[in-house]
Amino acid sequence: MTRLGVLYTANTSSLIPSAEKIAARQGLTLVPILVESNKDLPKAIDSLASTVQGIWSVADPNLFSSKSTRYILLNALRKRIPFMGFSRNVVESGALFALDFDYKAVGFQAGQIANKILAGARPDSINVTNADVLWFHYNENTAKHIDVTIPEELVAVAKEVYR
């Protein structure tokens, strides 16, 4: 895979520049498609289907309603394009895989930050942090349908495998 598409809205446009840099470091070209309204979705999916080998999704509530998510998943499956979801639920519905947060661990991290503030630290002195724990969710049925093989070492560490 060399070209990875991503659908986004104005709500998540700030994520795209850093995602492009990260993708480039991995030898990938990120192909971002701005979706201004759900009416633009069919054209955006068709555009990506002809130019990328996979679609990555950002958790964007303006883009991913239950109806639009179904549409994207159905078209990705029909076109045999791997769709990388943003949650366990999207993988259960047909995305190839997702990295999802362990929300209990995120809550613990938030508590640690709150304790620092309560102990007198200025909020602007606390660095932004990423989640310490991520879960890998994988849909084996989707992998078979689109003829993609996920390395066994990844499958072995999956929190959930949907068969």
Located regions from the model:
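Short hydrophobic alpha-helices and adjacent helix-cap/hinge residues
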Residues: 1-163
